[in-house]
From Swiss-Prot:
Residue positions binding heme b b566: 97
Protein's name according to its UniProt entry: Cytochrome b
Gene Ontology molecular function: metal ion binding; ubiquinol-cytochrome-c reductase activity
Its biological purpose: Component of the ubiquinol-cytochrome c reductase complex (complex III or cytochrome b-c1 complex) that is part of the mitochondrial respiratory chain. The b-c1 complex mediates electron transfer from ubiquinol to cytochrome c. Contributes to the generation of a proton gradient across the mitochondrial membrane that is then used for ATP synthesis.
Entry superkingdom: Eukaryota
Name of the coding gene: MT-CYB
Positions that bind heme b b562: 83
Cofactor: heme b
GO biological process: one example: mitochondrial electron transport, ubiquinol to cytochrome c
PROSITE patterns per UniProt: CYTB_NTER
TM ranges: 33-53, 77-98, 113-133
Species: Promops centralis (Big crested mastiff bat)
Gene3D superfamilies the UniProt entry points to: Cytochrome Bc1 Complex, Chain C
Keywords, comma-separated and alphabetical: Electron transport, Heme, Iron, Membrane, Metal-binding, Mitochondrion, Mitochondrion inner membrane, Respiratory chain, Transmembrane, Transmembrane helix, Transport, Ubiquinone
One GO cellular component term: mitochondrial inner membrane
Length: 176
C-alpha cells in the first residue's frame, strides 16, 4: 500500500519539496528557514489580499471595518490573526535565517550577502508601510515613533522626517 503523500499529485509536490528533499545529510534544521520564509510570505500575501477587500481608510469607520471582518466575514477572525501572527513568524524566520548565515560565514559571499541586505531593507520598508497604513490610532503612533528614529541622523535627520511626513506632523490616524 502506497503512502498518500507519495501517491497524491498535490501531496507529492509538498512531499518532494519539504519531507523527502534530496539534500546532503550534514544540513541541519537551520537550513529550513528559507522555505519557511516562503510559506510565511505566501500566507501574508493571501491573508492581506482578503483583508484588503474589506479595508477602509476613513478614520470614522476604520474600527467598524475591523469588527466587520471579525464578526461578519466567514473566518475573518482567522484571517486577521493569521495575518498578524504570520508577520511575527515571518520576521522570526527572517532573523534566524540571517543568524544562520552569520554563523556559517555566508557573509564572505559578498554579492549574495549584499542582495540579502537589500531584500532585508525592502522587507522592512514593506512591513513599515503595512503597519502604518491600516486602521486605528496605533498606525499614527507607529508612524510617529518609527519615523522619528530617522531624526537621529546627523544634519539631515529632522528634514528627512518632515519630508517623509509630508509636513510638520502626521494628520490622521491613517496615512492615506
Amino acid at each position: 500500500m502506497t503512502n498518500i503523500r507519495k501517491s497524491h499529485p498535490l501531496m507529492k509536490i509538498v512531499n518532494d519539496a519539504f519531507i523527502d528533499l534530496p539534500a546532503p545529510s550534514n544540513i541541519s534544521w537551520w537550513w529550513n528557514f528559507g522555505s519557511l520564509l516562503g510559506v510565511c510570505l505566501m500566507m501574508q500575501i493571501l491573508t492581506g489580499l482578503f483583508l484588503a477587500m474589506h479595508y477602509t481608510s476613513d478614520t470614522a469607520t476604520a474600527f467598524n471595518s475591523v469588527t466587520h471582518i471579525c464578526r461578519d466575514v466567514n473566518y475573518g477572525w482567522l484571517l486577521r490573526y493569521l495575518h498578524a501572527n504570520g508577520a511575527s513568524m515571518f520576521f522570526i524566520c527572517l532573523y534566524l535565517h540571517i543568524g544562520r548565515g552569520l554563523y556559517y560565514g555566508s557573509y564572505t559571499y559578498t554579492e549574495t550577502w549584499n542582495v540579502g541586505i537589500i531584500l532585508l531593507f525592502a522587507v522592512m520598508a514593506t512591513a513599515f508601510m503595512g503597519y502604518v497604513l491600516p486602521w486605528g490610532q496605533m498606525s499614527s503612533w507607529g508612524a510617529t515613533v518609527i519615523t522619528n528614529l530617522l531624526s537621529a541622523i546627523p544634519y539631515i535627520g529632522t528634514d528627512l522626517v518632515g519630508w517623509i511626513w509630508g509636513g510638520f506632523s502626521v494628520d490622521k490616524a491613517t496615512l492615506t
